[in-house]
Amino acid sequence: MSVFTGWRAALRIARHDAMRSKGRSALVVAMIAVPVLGVTALDVTYRSVTPTTAEQLTASMGSADALFSDEDIGPILQLPDAERYEQVDENAPVDEDGPSIDVTTTFPKGSRAISIQSVPAGITTGYGIATTEIYEFRTSDPLARGKIDLVRGAFPHGKDQVAATEPFLKSTGLHIGSTTTVRNFGKKYTITGVVEQPDQLNVEALYADPGAVIAPWQARADHDKKVLPPNVGSKEWLVKGPEGVGVTWPDVMAANKSGVLVKSRQVVLDPPPESEIPLARKGVEAYPDSSGELSAALVTVVAMAILEIVLLAGPAFAVGARRSRRQLGLLGTCGGDRRHVRAVVLGGGLVLGGAGAAAGVGVGLAATAVFRPVIEEWAGNRFVSISLNPMELLIIAVIGLITGLLAAFAPAIVASRQSVLESLTGRRGVRRSSRVLPVLGACVLAIGCAVAVYGGTDGNSTLVAAGSVTAELGLLACIPVIVGFLGRLGSRLPLSPRLALRDAARNRGRTAPAVAAVMAAVAGSVAIATYMSSAMAEAEYNYVPVLNEDTVVISAFDDKAAARLPQARAAVERNMAVTGGHADFRHAWAGSDCNVYGDAENECGSVELVKPAGEAASCPLTGKGAKELAARLTADEHKKLMRSPACLVGIMSSGVFNAGEHGIVVADEAILSTYVKLDDPAAAKALAAGTPVLLNPVFAKNGEVTIKAVHAYSDKDKQGQKLHPGKARTTTDRLKVYVAPEKYAATPGINMILPRKTAERIGLRTQVSGSVYAVAHPPTGAEEQRTYGAIEQSGGGIWTQSESGPGGIDNSMLLILTLFAGMVTLGAAAITTGLAKADAEADLNTLSAVGAPPGVRRKLSGFQCVVVALTGVVLGTLAGLVPAVALRMVDLRQALQMMRMEPTESAYTPIVLPWTTLGLLVVGVPLLAGLLATALTRSRLALARRAG
């Protein structure tokens, strides 16, 4: 019999066995198909979400041939992709006040064009007032298709209609048919339709026809000086070139001579030779395309996913081989040898692996198509089409098929080693565990950890992936010994858990693969969850807040607006989740107030909080020798320096309380509890007595601070000039201060709180400027719009600020990972419970024969499930930490490189464990698995066929 004939028979037997045991076969197919499905969906989604060059051009210029824009720097040279350009004469001065170029004169003859120009504006909403961007862009023109598309309703036509994006409508409470007023000049517009930018679905904006907003606004501002003119953006043009010609490279270079930058579709898709590109001849190169680069995290995840498929399907094939041992024994009686037995089991892997791979690819494609709208909303851009790469899909299917074979390999070896007599009688015989395997596994585990860590320090993604997989394989080899050790722990436990532990130890051949399956699923999830938690912690640390958390600040533009602060406070208290009273603050200045008179042509006063001389008051990361110091620092040492009071001066936000860069805020003790969160009676007593409270101790020397004031007066400040004629004078005052604990140096916007009477005593002028509130949560969009609307109704001139946090940090992915790992853990535990039930039928019969109650069967199944799930989860957690730590070391290496080039860049790269995820996995999942196994196990004994 030839090799092919033998394999044909083996595949036929495997197919018949799969059809006979449909439940087990479906489980194996699902085990293989689910990861293949995920990888397929990920591949198709990535290809569909990542736009091609042609799709990017359509998103930026619609169906036009080119995008023209005036750069206002004179004649330029550009690369074909328009991403890089330079002045022809780099030394030529830029005439900012010169006449603007008529861009339309640079279009090719016979072209047609439409313009795009934007302006920020305050508009009325369903809740109050909001600020948004209004684009003057003829969205109904065919040239706009692909850049702006209609979702529902109609495009605007005429001077009193606008279209809106869906996010704008959701945030403002408006809808098609609603009217909105541009507050800046009082004109009403009707919303006629919903449009979207296919490449930016989250944009909040309004779209009007050219001339509908900017021109009437400017006309109103020209006639009414109380109306501020529109702050318009630069104008761009979508140009359709002559039919059949388009916009060519000579057209681009001709426009460059007038200072116009051109992105031409045909030039980008078919660039001219380098010899015809003047800027390229100067040595300027295009930005590199990094789309083909694979990150260390991606390589590691793919490698662990392949291993996970193998380990997940392995227990199911072990179930099949054990349940089919009588059939395999009959194969031996008919003259088959070990080679044929292995072929039958491997044939099962080939049959079920092929079915799982095909099902995974097919369902993955279908799932991507069905959930396309959800994926598009999540990604923030539309698919131009579902993009399929046949070669990649074929590789994914082949990997699924091969992993099915690999998963069946170990069960095939075990099945081929059983004697025919053992297979026919159902007896398992006695086989001692290998003493070499655990030692080898421990060595492999150590080597894998070392390789992964070295790869992390070296930034080598291949070594990180290889080391992580090697470490997991080493831990896998140690599982039989670990399971055997668990059997010794049950001597003092009640009957059911004691039997479960001993049964797991005695039957390591079926327990170990199930534990490995759980370990694989949990390891991947823990690795990703740990990496994500660490990245989130890093983002939170690096974020520089504008205000303290859960606070709202209202500030007046000038003294006239300050008179309306009581109405503004009432609006805040009525519309926001205020938790207490407010603290008022005042603006302090010397000479002429720079907020009123400060511009390029007029002089104004200044106030400065002077740092003491010496190294202690200077940040070593900003002065001379900073790079040399950074080269010697570790990440922890750099973090400590960056959070020192001296370095925080240059990091924390300023100007929030109309205080300028000096950070001196005139206020009373109420601001300590409302904003600073400093619960210190001594500090409050000091302010009440007229002693300033210093939050950043770097400005203090011997308990005193120095305030330098320049009393300069603007020519426009007639009253100041009259009272203080002559040259500007400079005063210096030393004040005793109460120094707060060092941690308060990180208070956003404030370096020192100065009592009003002390400020006036040293010659500073003060004016009530605003108030600060503590709130229960950051204001929602609706709350902000209601507050803004109420403030504008009272006369305006007051703005609100709140702290929104770092943003972009979403814990939903951690929840998804936890659910995935939990589901796989439950599945693997269910497999091993079913296998244990089949193997332990004789033991259960013996228990019943000696008088054990029926409930023992249920409890035994439950505890068997708990043993497998808990052991696998704990080992998987340990295995998952290896790649997570290694990947964070890759990030640390990159952060240190950046820090040594820019010493003030953060190198903080924490490793943070996702304790909630780990808690659910370690406690919740094994407990749930045990309860389900207990509930689903029958108490009654089934009649069994006599062995032999």
Would you name each region that the model predicts?
Residues 2-313, 319-322, 339, 344, ...:
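Membrane transport/envelope proteins' first extracytoplasmic loop
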Residues 23-48, 71, 442-446, 509-534, ...:
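Short, strongly hydrophobic transmembrane alpha-helices
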Residues 481-484, 488-680:
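Juxtamembrane segments of multi-pass membrane proteins
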